[in-house]
Design a protein with these regions (language model features):
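N-terminal cap/lid segment of alpha/beta-hydrolase-fold proteins
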Residues: 1-23
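Short, surface-exposed "cap/lid" segments of acyl-processing enzymes
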Residues: 22-58
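Short beta-to-alpha linker loops that shape the active-site pocket of alpha/beta-hydrolase fold enzymes
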Residues: 34, 64-69
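Alpha/beta-hydrolase active-site loop
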Residues: 76-95
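Alpha/beta-hydrolase fold nucleophile elbow
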Residues: 97-107
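Gly/Ala-rich beta-loop-alpha elbow adjacent to hydrolase catalytic centers
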Residues: 106-114
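A conserved short beta-strand
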Residues: 123-132
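Residue-level detector of conserved catalytic or cofactor/ligand-binding positions
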Residues: 132-138
Length: 139
C-alpha cells in the first residue's frame, strides 16, 4: 500500500493505493460515506472493501473527499466530491493504461457519488453500492 497526495480540483487529495503487479488487471476506486457525519477512507466497510478488492486482484484506490484528513478544500454537498472522484479515477487510469476493467464502489454518501460517476464515465463496467441513503422519511 502506498500513501499518495494526488493533485485535485481544490488542492491535494489524500489516498491509499495498492497496485497489482500485472498492468492489465482490473482497477477499482472506493468512495467513503458522508464526511459531515464522520465518513473517511478509513471507515470500516470501505477498508474491508479495499482488502477484498486487493485479494481479488484489483489495483485498488481509496481516498478522502475534500476537507477530510489531509485532503484540501471544503465539503461541497456532492458536486465537489464528484469532481474529486473523477480526478482520482483519472489518476488511477493514467497509471493502469492496460486495464480493461474499471469498477467503482461506494458506501452510503460514497454510493451516491459512485452512481453519479458511473453515469458520466462509460468506461466503468462494474460497481458496488452499499447502503444508499436518499432522504429522511417524512412523518
Amino acid at each position: 500500500m502506498v500513501d499518495l497526495l494526488i493533485p485535485g480540483p481544490e488542492g491535494t487529495i489524500e489516498a491509499k493505493y495498492s497496485h497489482n503487479n500485472r498492468d492489465d488487471w482490473p482497477i477499482v476506486i472506493l468512495l467513503h460515506p458522508d464526511p459531515t457525519k464522520g465518513g473517511t477512507m478509513h471507515t470500516k466497510i470501505v477498508f474491508k472493501m479495499y482488502k477484498i478488492f486487493i485479494k481479488a486482484g484489483f489495483s485498488t484506490i481509496r481516498f478522502n473527499f475534500r476537507g477530510v484528513g489531509k485532503s484540501e478544500g471544503f465539503f461541497d454537498d456532492g458536486e465537489g466530491e464528484l469532481s474529486d472522484a473523477a480526478c482520482v479515477l483519472d489518476w488511477l487510469q493514467q497509471y493502469n493504461t492496460n486495464s480493461k476493467i474499471c469498477w467503482v464502489a461506494g458506501f452510503s454518501f460514497g454510493g451516491w457519488i459512485a452512481m453519479q460517476l458511473l453515469m458520466r464515465r462509460p468506461e466503468i463496467n462494474g460497481f458496488v453500492l452499499s447502503l444508499i441513503h436518499i432522504s429522511e422519511p417524512t412523518r
